[in-house]
């Protein structure tokens, strides 16, 4: 008898967020990966999507050590998020596969872009809802604002004290140098190369 155990990303479906799994039969663990992938827990006020990074990593580790677990099913519904958190989840999935030799499947529901695509990449099989948005492979550092001129017009003077010439890189009150732009671009390029490599 094989039973599917549904584990909500907050753990509220079956077990409390901090409780361990206790199942009497063989099962396939289902992890719902919903919301923006980040290192911290996120709850969205405007939607029901919640993402609990540590909880997901702990459940993968628990199932890796559980002989009754016979595989993982990821239900992916995320726009992606942090490069670090996406990579940490990707590596946890790869480690689960390597140590257990059990199958891992991904079902891309309505959205699996960027980090959602990345965490699905190592899966043995990927299934996609025909209406799912997926892809959007890339890395962004986001928009960096410079409010120096605005503050000057308002009569506000700023002073930045640092211990290194690039320590204040990205500071909203200082102009970015060509060297700083190259440094930031190299960080984005490195993350992208890891993503597609």
Model region roles, listed by residue range:
Residues 1-102, 111-197:
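Small-residue-centered hinge/linker elements
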């Amino acid at each position: 008898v094989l039973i599917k155990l549904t584990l909500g990303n907050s753990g509220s479906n079956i077990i409390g967020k901090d409780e361990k799994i206790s199942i009497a039969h063989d099962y396939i663990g289902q992890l719902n990966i919903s919301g923006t992938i980040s290192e911290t827990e996120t709850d969205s006020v405007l939607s029901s999507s919640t993402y609990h990074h540590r909880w997901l990593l702990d459940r993968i580790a628990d199932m890796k050590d559980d002989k009754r677990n016979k595989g993982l099913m990821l239900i992916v519904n995320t726009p992606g998020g942090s490069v670090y958190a996406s990579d940490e989840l990707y590596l946890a999935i790869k480690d689960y596969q390597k140590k257990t030799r059990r199958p891992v499947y991904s079902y891309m529901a309505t959205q699996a872009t960027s980090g959602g695509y990345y965490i699905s990449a190592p899966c043995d099989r990927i299934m996609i809802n025909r209406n799912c948005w997926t892809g959007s492979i890339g890395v962004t550092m986001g928009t960096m604002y410079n409010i120096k001129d605005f503050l000057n017009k308002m009569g506000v003077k700023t002073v930045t004290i640092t211990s290194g010439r690039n320590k204040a890189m990205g500071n909203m009150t200082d102009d970015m140098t060509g060297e700083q732009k190259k440094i930031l671009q190299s960080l984005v390029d490195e993350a992208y190369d890891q993503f597609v490599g």
